[in-house]
């Protein structure tokens, strides 16, 4: 069984959708506080539809509580930290039964100290640079130039987690994939590598 870990999720519909994915794949959902919503929120349950009552879900007071209750160390080999800041892609990783796929909050991702404690556990989902993925890429690049940003500063701006959803209306770019899409992509790769057990 695989484990999906959401560190400080903010959008209830994303958590509901991920919960539904966990039910149909037999994965365990771990929610690390603080949460940006109540688990009683109608939006969470609506997104999870009739699956929510069958969900195997555990909530934790924080990252240390999550590690302690699951017998993990910060750089444990069973952890896979999904972030845009990684060099290695998720497809280059080897997944084993019992692994934990960790995704950060929609607005800021996994906190820097957690990534810095385990750089070898960091993975990313490959995607186009934000400005290259839009029809208005030229407008974005012109906007960057008007702000005096160099290529280096643009790369710094792009350093957001793979799970980012929020788009600054002053920016002409997409921040990243939706959290529930990201979780499904990586979970199904892990299931593929292990032969889709029980499916």
What are the language-model segments listed below?
Residues 1-199:
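Post-transcriptional modification and biogenesis factors for structured RNAs
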């Amino acid at each position: 069984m695989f484990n999906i870990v959401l560190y400080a999720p903010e959008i209830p519909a994303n958590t509901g959708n991920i919960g539904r994915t966990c039910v149909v794949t037999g994965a365990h959902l771990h929610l690390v506080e603080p949460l940006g919503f109540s688990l009683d929120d109608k939006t969470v349950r609506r997104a999870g539809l009739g699956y929510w009552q069958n969900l195997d879900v555990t909530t934790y007071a924080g990252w240390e509580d999550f590690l302690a209750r699951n017998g993990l160390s910060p750089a444990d080999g069973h952890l896979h930290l999904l972030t845009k800041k990684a060099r290695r892609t998720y497809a280059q990783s080897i997944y084993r039964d019992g692994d934990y796929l960790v995704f950060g909050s929609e607005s800021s991702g996994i906190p820097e100290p957690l990534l810095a404690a385990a750089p070898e556990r960091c993975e990313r989902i490959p995607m186009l640079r934000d400005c290259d993925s839009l029809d208005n890429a030229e407008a974005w690049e012109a906007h960057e130039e008007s702000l005096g940003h160099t290529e280096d500063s643009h790369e710094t701006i792009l350093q957001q987690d793979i799970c980012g959803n929020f788009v600054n209306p002053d920016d002409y770019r997409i921040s990243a994939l939706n959290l529930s899409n990201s979780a499904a992509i990586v979970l199904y790769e892990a299931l593929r590598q292990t032969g889709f057990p029980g499916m």
